[in-house]
Amino acid sequence: MGQALYELLLSYNSSLSWTSLSDRWRLSRRNGIKLAFSALCAGSLRASETRDESTQGPGLTGSIPPRSLQALTGSQFADSVSNVDRQQRERAILGQLFEGNLPGFLRKLAPVKLTYELASGKTLAATIFVVPEYLAIGSDHDFLRIPMNLHTAVAIANRFGFVLPTKKMVDAIYDHSPCQFKPQPLPAGPQMMSTEYYRVHNAMIEKQSETRGFPFGALVSGHKKDVVVTNRLTKRPGQIAIYGWHRGAGAPIQPLSTVHGAGYADYSHGIRLVSRLAMIEGRLRCVHDILQDSVLANVLSDEGAIRLASAYGAA
């Protein structure tokens, strides 16, 4: 990837009106997703085409609001939702993240390269840009990695200008991560969905990170399952797709599954956001468009072409 294009990508600043997007989303969930992707891609590429390389904007995370100095820490947020039901907790998660209450290090994206070899022998290559950790609420010094259901995850991804990863992306992120956690499952049961389990698992991850000396803000993986997009959801709308929690390269604990409903979330789930803009064959393209291309999609997906609106199911 050329340095000029790389700098151009990292200096991107979206000018899309989220009020307009929100209005369209409410018209129809499925059609709203299609409209959202079309508007997001068009806005992204227009901004990238007109931005001077020397202009330093907030980058691909420019649609994420700044964190308020008065925002809750991760511990405070956990306390605030410890005795509410799951629906109330989801609304609280959405509210906190929409207000920009997430650690600063999540705004510094990491490049991850993926490839696909054509029958002709030519290798196609793409670089996606991902948040270095799973979504969390709080500050750099006190944050809670926060699982959430598919409805909440899709709303946040679209609001911030991101998409959820494919299964192939999850594998690539794990392979590229310099810091790979060893999975730490907790006993199964209804308590898996509790805020207390969220806290306990978060503390376990922090302890392992400190023990193994993982650098702050590094690209990490292996500590949670990913919520992903998949064509399976076109046949199982209303479900959530999860995959990952790797024990090593090519060895996920969780194979691709759509057994749970879209409203389900437990401590083992994580939301990894992927920028809606990627570099492929030296060009800036929208991930949505790449995944719809019958050839290019293979670089980012091991399922072939994926229509994201359908792949999100009934989110």
What do these predicted regions represent?
Residues 55-103:
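N-terminal module-boundary/linker segments of secreted carbohydrate-active enzymes
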Residues 1-27, 38-42:
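N-terminal secretory signal peptides
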Residues 192-245:
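Acidic, glycine-rich loop-and-strand cores that form catalytic or ligand-binding grooves
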Residues 101-130:
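Conserved oxyanion/phosphate-binding beta-strand-loop segments in alpha/beta enzyme cores
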Residues 23-33, 47-54:
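Twin-arginine (Tat) signal peptide motif
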Residues 150-213, 273:
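Conserved hydrophobic ligand-interaction patch in extracellular adhesion modules
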Residues 137-144, 159-160, 259-260:
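Second-shell loop/turn segments in exported
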Residues 266-315:
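Low-complexity, Gly/Ser/Thr/Pro-rich intrinsically disordered linker/tail segments
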